[in-house]
Amino acid sequence: MATFLERYQAGDHLAVWDELMALGEGVRSEHCYADALAVAAETMRRARHNVELLIQRLDAKGYRFRDRVSSAEEKISRLDVMDQMSAQFETMAKRTPTSYNIHSMKMLETMQAMKAKVAPLLEKVAANAAKEAAAKRKPPLEDPYVFSPPDAETPGLLERLEKAAGGPVPLSLRAWYEQVGGVSLMGSDPALNPVDFSNRNVLQQFQSLVKGAVPIPSPGEECAPDPLVIYPLDALMEDLLDEDSEESDDGDELQLVISPDDLHKANISGDAYYITLPDAGADFKFDDWHKDRFVNYLRKVFQWGGFPGWARSKNPPGKELAELSEGLLPL
């Protein structure tokens, strides 16, 4: 009788993962654990191949990744926007009718006091951001903001994660971090991901608010492309430390952020995608808008060239997405 791995390698991808999930915690039984783990590892080896190919193809298209340099430029832009908003608020406060002026001035004083208090920190942030923005841009596969593959610390971090969670992580998640690591396809491109990370939109919305106007969404804003982002394992551990410092109402369950959600990725105030641990199953529910299992989520990611949010659009950039997804390995 063929093993799960042999069947998976022969192309029976969907059925194998369905059967592994149907086993529940039994997937960790002595007679099938090694086989199931091998399937998870093979799946994520394919995922890594696809991730690296997508990054290379996006780079060749001139995609502007949200890498170390552009992230630093974004910080500088955000600080500049804060200064402009503060100045505009001061002007607004002075022009406010007398009956409201007292409240406006109090708000302004509070804002200025907070700004003065954090000024040294902001100066340090600005200096570090300027230094990083001036640095030479690395190829995206070498930039940890885009791709951070597993290293010698990965096994120890996984062990610490399971110890903190009080139980195992799903086989698919373990294999992801052992084979792939952290990935972020966040960035901007006129067709694939028309997102402005300069924070100019924040200033424009503030200006509209000051003028009493309501911003009108631009065409196409109804669809967030939702590029693939899975936080590095060390970022999950930082989130875990934050969890430890707060009291949880979930009993023994531990909820960690694994990725920003589609709106957050689009530079709109959003939330995140979470994972709940411990989980002894083969795979886990990926808490995005699909509400599907992680492996199925990855299948959709690669089907849509790294941008599964376009599945909701009536007019996706079909040519570009087809070029990105061509020849990717099936999971």
Segments the model singles out, each with a brief description of its role:
Residues 170-180:
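Short hydrophobic alpha-helical segments that form membrane-spanning helices or hydrophobic packing faces
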Residues 1-159, 178-331:
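A C-terminal-region feature
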